[in-house]
Design a protein with these regions (language model features):
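A short acidic, Gly/Pro-enriched loop at the edge of an enzyme's catalytic core
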Residues: 106-118
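Conserved beta-strand signature within the Rossmann-like core of class I S-adenosyl-L-methionine
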Residues: 145-151
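A short SAM/SAH-binding and catalytic strip from SAM-dependent methyltransferases
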Residues: 117-129
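Conserved SAM-binding loop
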Residues: 85-86
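Conserved SAM/SAH-binding beta-strand->alpha-helix loop
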Residues: 78-80
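Conserved alpha-helix/loop element of class I SAM-dependent methyltransferases that forms part
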Residues: 28-47, 62
Length: 198
């Protein structure tokens, strides 16, 4: 396995000391996207929010600050990511505002129509089966809720065999049942934001 392959494996499912270092690097590297996320999230105070693939927990922290009266949930299938997310959000976890669980996007451990907003920040290109996983997201999203995918374009093109184009993603969202789909790009930074309303 090459060094690049090892780093990609750690980015997908961080593990151990190297995984923890990778998560800290991602927390810093993604701060610009977190700022951009704030502009497009439009979260109402009191919302129940899920971040899928919460990684090192920086996005959970951002979402918590945006939503002082709400609850923020995070899932990741990496045990190391869960540990690091809890550490990053220690006070909010202790007071019950942030709840973090080890889980897969393919089987989200919450009831139907539970969340007002669901985010997937730099993760959807790692999901096991994007079409079925988007259906699972739709299941736990409330009517009127929104699903936000945010990613760097080059990562989509590198990691994904299908759903590489905005039209393919838009068709997927429509086929699942999302009513209003908005695609926002920051060409200068190479960011893509897809918002689907249920």
């Amino acid at each position: 396995m090459t060094l690049l392959q090892r780093l990609i494996k750690q980015a997908k499912k961080p593990n151990g000391f190297v995984g923890s270092v990778m998560l800290r690097i991602m927390n810093v590297a993604h701060s610009g996207m977190n700022t951009w996320l704030i502009k497009h999230c439009d979260i109402c105070d009191g919302d129940i929010v899920l971040d899928i693939g919460c990684g090192g927990g920086k996005t959970l922290q951002t979402l918590s600050k945006m939503n002082p009266g709400g609850k923020i949930y995070g899932i990741d299938f990496s045990e190391q990511a869960i540990k690091d997310s809890i550490k990053t959000n220690k006070m909010d976890v202790a007071n019950g505002k942030v709840i973090v669980k080890q889980a897969s996007v393919s089987n989200i451990p919450y009831t139907d129509q539970f969340f007002d907003t669901i985010t997937a920040f730099q993760t959807h290109y790692f999901w096991p089966d994007l079409a079925n996983d988007v259906k699972e997201v739709f299941r736990v999203l409330k009517h009127g809720g929104k699903f936000i995918i945010m990613s760097e374009l080059y990562k989509i093109h590198y990691h994904m065999k299908v759903y590489k184009t905005t039209s393919e993603i838009e068709q997927l969202f429509e086929s699942v049942g999302f009513q209003k789909i908005q695609i926002i790009q920051n060409a200068r930074k190479g960011y893509l934001c897809i918002i689907g309303m249920k």
